[in-house]
UniProtKB/Swiss-Prot annotation:
Its main location: mitochondrion. Residues 484-653 are annotated as: Intron maturase type-2. This is Nuclear intron maturase 1, mitochondrial. CDD domains: RT_G2_intron. GO terms for molecular function: endonuclease activity. Residues 147-459 form the Reverse transcriptase domain. PANTHER family: NUCLEAR INTRON MATURASE 1, MITOCHONDRIAL, NUCLEAR INTRON MATURASE 1, MITOCHONDRIAL-RELATED. One of its GO terms (cellular component) is mitochondrion. It is an enzyme of class 3 (hydrolase). The lineage of its organism: Eukaryota, Viridiplantae, Streptophyta, Embryophyta, Tracheophyta.
Amino acid sequence: MKRLTYPLSSLRNIVEHFHCNTFHKPISSLSISPTLKSESREPSSTQDPYSLLKQDPVDICLSLWVKSFSSPPSATFSNLTGFLSKFDLWVLAYQRTCAHVTGTFPPRNAIHANALRSLLSLQNAVTRSGGKFRWNDKMNQYVRSPKDKISMNGGEGMSKGKVRRIIESEEPIFQDRVVHEVLLMILEPFFEARFSSKSHGFRPGRNPHTVIRTIRSNFAGYLWFMKGDVSEMLDHVDVDVVMNCLQKVVKDRKVLGLIESSLKFSDKRVLKRVVEKHGNDNGLGTKRRIEREKRNKTKKKILSDDEPKPDPYWLRTFYSFAPKEAAKVPSYGYCGVLSPLLANVCLNELDRFMETKIVEYFSPCKDDSIWKESIEDGCHNPAWPEFVPSSGKEKTRKMDYIRYGGHFLIGIRGPREDAVKMRKEIIDFCDRVFGVRLDNSKLEIEHISRGIQFLDHIICRRVIYPTLRYTGSGGSIVSKKGVGTLLSVSASLEQCIRQFRRLAFVKGDKDPEPLPCNPMLYSSQSHSNSQMNKFLETMADWYKYADNRKKAVGFCAYVIRSSLAKLYAARYRLKSRAKVYSIASRDLSHPLSESSNNSAPEYSDLLRMGLVDAIEGVQFSRMSLIPSCDYTPFPRNWIPNHEQVLQEYIRLQDPKFFCGLHRSIKREGLTLPQDEISEAVWDFKTLGAWRSKYENKREADDGLQKLDSQT
């Protein structure tokens, strides 16, 4: 019997590293002079915050995930205020918020007592019925950021202009971020257990790679594709729509009230942005703003000791290659990191609607080569889908759906009329449920032969002519030429060129010419090569599941290597890339130096003395060094590892499982896996069959006798 067990420590480590895949710029909390505070916040003098630290917060999060995944899908949760009252969760939320703001995760025992008392005051203001907590209350902050420069005894005040800019800022303050983290840790488990498996955006364990692998595995055989765009829901959504979706799972009034109050600020913020955008300043304000932005770009910034370092150049460059489906992050009112979760809560209604339509549309046909009987038939290899004939009147009708963020893709095996009908139903559903009116431009229908771009990958069909060999009636080998189609998922080189051109790495369209990498002008050769190597490694991983991975990564390596060569030619006065390559070699790993500086010591001497860093060559200088596409099979009903661990852990906690295990041990006894393998090999070697596939000894003897009579 095959058993899969996970220790509690393994499950604990997985739950401990759950996080929201949303990137926000680190910000500082408001620092207001004590003279501006409207009222003082007195923490509870009767409660010692250290006495409230009773549990490990990771164990509390673990219990939430186990409870949510073990509950039936239709279950609702009406008492979540008890989790809000657990001070251990607030301490963990404070630690995570500090990590976002300062870049370091403070240990629990390193948090100052004053910070714990302020955190307790914030908890009381949120949880108690008469609490005075308000979102974005910059004049009355309970908890301050560790980056706050104002000391506890007063400190120095700020100028009126800086105070006004902070008050008018739309960035959430530190204490709001703490409340966001607490609500996220409580709400995420209950909704993750009920989200559709068709959704992959802003969810733990899922990413664009899982979307691409799912398309390769499940979307073979579809002729018509519909690419939908509902990303306007990531910018603004009606408060009633969000609350109605939340109330299907959460019934706690306190939690719902906190979320509703944070969403109501959304309309005011949108209105403020519209007024600022269309304001009448006769061009003077815009001109000053542009000049100020230029000065800020060229101004050298000195980081504080506790300020996180900005992202390195290679990472900023890679983020610029983000596809449009993954570039937009939801932002609702003052919800902060809760916004992606709330967006998925709303769009989950669309996922469930499409799952119902998929079942209704399925119409099997015995004469087809795939999906003859069941919608779950997987008769072709999930890594390399088998040859799929075209659909017709007598062929199977089938549909599939997948969503990433505010963009989704629908594959239809049937006539185009069915795709048009499905588009009308989606438009009516979004108008009725979300109040969003979509036009046909947001729901484009394309044939597979034209290619569909999704997540900067092109989904198309390749026609191939394989030679099919089979054994004829007389025992001879028959070879026959066949025709088939193969689903292809390849990287979009046109989109890659556009991104390089936008970042000033190349110029031109059809035959792009590399440009020097000016941002690395004042960096050393070793640092420049190291930065570009990290970028190329990340790009090679991004195109990991593209059929043309070698071609795409090879083009990126050519652009980066040529850009660096032009930069070195200008820096070391070598006039051309050819001279740079002749000195530094093809991968630019040999040191370069100015020809006019003959008194400079040799690079080998400086390297031996530790005065310079070793120069690593630019990767992927030859096509043979670029890894091929990863065709690892992807299961059709794939679920992330943390969900597998949770399901297995819940199953091991069920007494019925151990009763069944005990009965099987009493009936079959204990055997080692090595013994079972040896028995199977011996049976196949001596008898040509495995005894264990029969239920009893009599069936085994009858089956073996039939095999003997046939031979």
